[in-house]
Amino acid sequence: MVTVEEVRKAQRAQGPATIMAIGTSTPQNCVDQSTYPDYYFRITNSEHLVELKEKFKRMCEKSMIKKRYMYLTEEILTENPNICAYMAPSLDARQDIVVVEVPKLGKEAAQKAIKEWGQPKSKITHLVFCTTSGVDMPGADYQLTKLLGLQPSVKRFMMYQQGCFAGGTVIRLAKDLAENNKGARVLVVCSEITAVTFRGPSDAHLDSLVGQALFGDGAAALIIGSDPDPDLERPLFQLVSAAQTILPDSGGAIDGHLREVGLTFHLLKDVPGLISKHIEKSLNEAFQPLGIRDWNSLFWIAHPGGPAILDQVEEKLELKPEKLRATRHVLSEYGNMSSACVLFILDEMRKASSKEGLNTTGEGLEWGVLFGFGPGLTVETVVLHSVSA
């Protein structure tokens, strides 16, 4: 007769969780940031707000974003004037869009990840789906299971309304699932569509306007598992540790509220200051066991909440400009895609490392850090170990 301890030992994987494939996807509609203020004020019938438009132009110029992708086209917005108005009842119209489109965009990213992984999708044992775009029952996890034709026995986790830190959260959860379930292969999907937050401008709500200048649509997917089969699977990054914390004195710094008018967004000006003030504590706690104190010796994947956050973190930690190159590249090419951003940056980093002939997936370096920042203020910290190219 076996003991509980023996059963538990047999259930656990041997090695650390590993990212084995990455896929990304965006809507087809691409928006140029330089012409966006004119388009945005025209489509929302707000061209009479001349001073506010100038303010928005400056926001877009300072955003360090070149382009974004958005499901909401001019045609869709023309058909849904309440989505364009400032604070008009519009939740039903928004929900009708995202409940269908969020799983569909997630499917595109997931298919790319599964193709790279190279294994039959029947081997996927767990699904973690994350979105801040709408809420439904059964959830986007169920819809994606049906769209992909996954096994009905796949073990699903649905994470709604987490916000911008959640790219770290899904990795932390997938790590625990992979390491505690021998043979588990976890499909992780983050899919975000700004149809829940888009609305016209108001000079009484400038933080909403900041969101209109920053947010973009995108989905990203990972395959995560422990003990990769060397003949069939190719590891990209190992997940060494993962932590979450709420920053002190940060209540109300970033809030989102789902209302009749859609998802409203509030942020305090001091968000970059709060993050940069406390980030070294998270780094010390994560890397002390490894004896690492030189933050420039790491490869960096940081959620690009906005250029000010990146600038202040860079300054506070005395990071060399190239440390946040991959992060700034994704911000420039896609905008802030909430939970999906850090997964896009992982993809950008491994591709650039390969293209440049570097000897690891992490810009030629061995150890790296992934940060998620979002409502709370909540910070996710993941320690990564790169894989030899």
Swiss-Prot record:
It catalyses: (E)-4-coumaroyl-CoA + 3 malonyl-CoA + 3 H(+) = 2',4,4',6'-tetrahydroxychalcone + 3 CO2 + 4 CoA. The keyword Transferase applies. Keywords: Acyltransferase, Flavonoid biosynthesis, Transferase. Disulfide bonds: none annotated. The active site is at residue 164. InterPro entries: Chalcone/stilbene_synt_C (IPR012328), Chalcone/stilbene_synt_N (IPR001099), Chalcone/stilbene_synthase_AS (IPR018088), Polyketide_synthase_type-III (IPR011141), Thiolase-like (IPR016039). Its EC number is 2.3.1.74. Pathway: Secondary metabolite biosynthesis; flavonoid biosynthesis. One of its GO terms (biological process) is flavonoid biosynthetic process. Pfam families: Chal_sti_synt_C (PF02797), Chal_sti_synt_N (PF00195). GO terms for molecular function: naringenin-chalcone synthase activity. The primary product of this enzyme is 4,2',4',6'-tetrahydroxychalcone (also termed naringenin-chalcone or chalcone) which can under specific conditions spontaneously isomerize into naringenin. Belongs to the thiolase-like superfamily. Chalcone/stilbene synthases family. This is Chalcone synthase E. It comes from Ipomoea purpurea (Common morning glory). The lineage of its organism: Eukaryota, Viridiplantae, Streptophyta, Embryophyta, Tracheophyta.
